[in-house]
Structure formats: C-alpha cells, structure tokens
C-alpha cells in the first residue's frame, strides 16, 4: 500500500463545507427560526461512508442542523482487528463506546476501552483508534466542538498514517447496518 503524506483520501476532505454561517438579521426572526428547528434527527436516513475497515456517518453538524452550530456528532464503525487513521487535530473529542472493545493510543500511551466506556481525546493529541474484538466491530459515538475550533481558525489537522486500504480477512463484504 502506498501512502502519500498529502493524499486526500476521503470525500469529506473534498467537499465544500460551511465553516461559519452568517449571523445577521433581527433577533425575533432568528429566535423564531431557532424554535422551528427539529430537536430529533433520524440518523437511519444518513448512509455510512468510508470502508473497507472503517466507516463513518454524520449525525449532527452545522451543515445538517442549524440549531447546532458549535458541535458535531458522528458514528464510527471499525471492523474487528483493524484500526482507523493515526491523526491529530486541535479540538478535543469524547467517544462513547456503543458496541465492541478496543483501545486507543494517545501520544504513545495505550488505553483499553469497551462498550459503555467513554474515552476523551484532548486538544492537540496525536491518536489512533483500534478495534480489538474478534467477532464484533467497534461502534463509537463521537462528539466534538470542532465547528467552534474551525470558527476560531484552529484548523490544524493531520493524518500520520492512513487506515488499511484492504479489508480484514472474513470482513470483505461488511457494511454497517443502517
């Protein structure tokens, strides 16, 4: 597998993003619009992207939910005995482990986790997520204040190593269930 440091591998790096939406207008109108926003988002309608070993789907983002301009949440699914990219970013993140077991490495230190645990990645930490379970993928809810960091132009994010480009044996046809 050839990896290039500047390789733009994922669609989310290619698409146009809204980093900060315009904040202008009458307070009464903005407040009315805020009250009209849905408070429940049906994530089953959002497809998973990625693969073949790590999949992601956005749940809440400034692009999809104007009520939430400073937070985002997504679900990551990583197949057994695999891992995500080794990377770092300026924003902190909280990972709630929904299913499976695995470990993270944060700035060289290993931390084991399993379903029901929460894992915190601090600001500026170089980290990587691993799915250790032999039979079940790791399913993780990720919550970040990344939009707020982007607003303050704290844009640094870098991949050190990409995830595997080939599926793990026995998981060649895996797709997360919606």
Regions found by a protein language model. Name each.
Residues 74-76, 102-104, 124, 128-132:
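A structural feature that tracks compact, well-ordered secondary-structure segments
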Residues 1-69, 156-178:
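A short, N-terminal "cap"/entry segment at the start of jelly-roll beta-barrel domains
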Residues 79-80, 90-102, 108:
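Glycine- and acidic-residue-biased ligand/ion/polar-headgroup-sensing regions
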Residues 67, 123-151:
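Ligand-binding loop in jelly-roll beta-barrel domains
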Residues 108-124:
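Short acidic-glycine-tyrosine-enriched beta hairpin
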Residues 57-61, 72-88:
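Conserved short histidine dyad/triad with adjacent acidic residue
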Residues 67, 83-89, 112, 130-132:
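Short histidine-centered beta-strand/loop micro-motifs
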């Amino acid at each position: 597998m050839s990896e290039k440091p500047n390789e733009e591998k994922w669609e989310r790096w290619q698409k146009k993003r809204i980093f900060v939406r315009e904040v202008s207008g009458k307070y009464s109108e903005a407040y009315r619009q805020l009250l009209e926003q849905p408070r429940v988002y049906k994530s089953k309608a959002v497809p998973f992207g990625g693969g073949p070993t790590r999949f992601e789907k956005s749940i809440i983002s400034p692009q999809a939910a104007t009520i939430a301009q400073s937070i985002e949440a997504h679900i990551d699914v990583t197949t057994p005995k695999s891992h995500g990219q080794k990377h770092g970013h300026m924003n902190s993140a909280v990972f709630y482990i929904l299913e499976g077991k695995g470990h993270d490495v944060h700035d060289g230190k290993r931390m084991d986790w399993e379903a029901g645990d929460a894992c915190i990645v601090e600001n500026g930490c170089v980290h990587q997520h691993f799915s250790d379970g032999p039979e079940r993928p790791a399913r993780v809810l990720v919550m970040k204040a990344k939009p707020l960091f982007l607003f303050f132009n704290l844009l640094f994010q870098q991949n050190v190593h990409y995830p595997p480009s080939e599926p793990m044996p026995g998981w060649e046809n895996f797709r997360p269930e919606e």
